[in-house]
Amino acid sequence: MRKVDLCSVTEGTEVILATSSDEKHPPENIIDGNPETFWTTTGMFPQEFIICFHKHVKIEKLVIQSYLVRTLRIEKTTSKEPLDFEQWVEKDLVHTEGQLQNEEIVARDGYATFLRFIIVSAFDHFASVHSISAEGLTVSSLP
């Protein structure tokens, strides 16, 4: 089996929910592979989005590019529907004035069908997520 970016639209991955949406910066931008696009929050926190893999995957490493995110919680589930999430990772990110935050998370027990990313707090009224990549393997397709 080959390792791939499981969060790529070419792998069939989708953002199926986001708590805020700006028509110029929609949540799909997180996984479109374009470094010029991003999703932005619309103020109030927490904000969240859910990524659906449409298959069972094993994530070995996550790389998140964001701006002004203070605390990020990531939850996962192996359910066929986006239910029964369990907390997986919670990180306080470092504020990087004028540049993107690059957070690399080496995953343990990274089995999932959905990931929920919760921006618990931010360094400003708005925050953005520019990209998420997940290095790993497809375990099986969903029945």
Swiss-Prot record:
Tissue-wise expression: Expressed predominantly in the testis (at protein level).
Protein name as it appears in the record: Intraflagellar transport protein 25 homolog
Binding positions for Ca(2+) per the UniProt entry: N29, D32, T37
Family listed: Belongs to the IFT25 family.
Domain of life assignment: Eukaryota
UniProt note: phenotype after gene disruption: Null mutants retain the ability to ciliate and survive through gestation. They die shortly after birth due to different phenotypes reminiscent of Shh signaling defects: polydactyly, cleft palate, lung isomerisms, and structural heart defects. Conditional knockout in male germ cells results in infertility, abnormal sperm morphology, significantly reduced sperm count and sperm mobility and disruption of sperm lipid rafts.
Species annotation: Mus musculus
Localization terms from the record: Cell projection, Cilium
GO molecular function: metal ion binding
Keywords, alphabetical: Calcium, Cell projection, Cilium, Differentiation, Metal-binding, Protein transport, Spermatogenesis, Stress response, Transport
Function (record text): Component of the IFT complex B required for sonic hedgehog/SHH signaling. May mediate transport of SHH components: required for the export of SMO and PTCH1 receptors out of the cilium and the accumulation of GLI2 at the ciliary tip in response to activation of the SHH pathway, suggesting it is involved in the dynamic transport of SHH signaling molecules within the cilium. Not required for ciliary assembly. Its role in intraflagellar transport is mainly seen in tissues rich in ciliated cells such as kidney and testis. Essential for male fertility, spermiogenesis and sperm flagella formation.
Pfam families the UniProt entry points to: F5_F8_type_C
InterPro entries noted in UniProt: FA58C, Galactose-bd-like_sf, IFT25
Main location: other
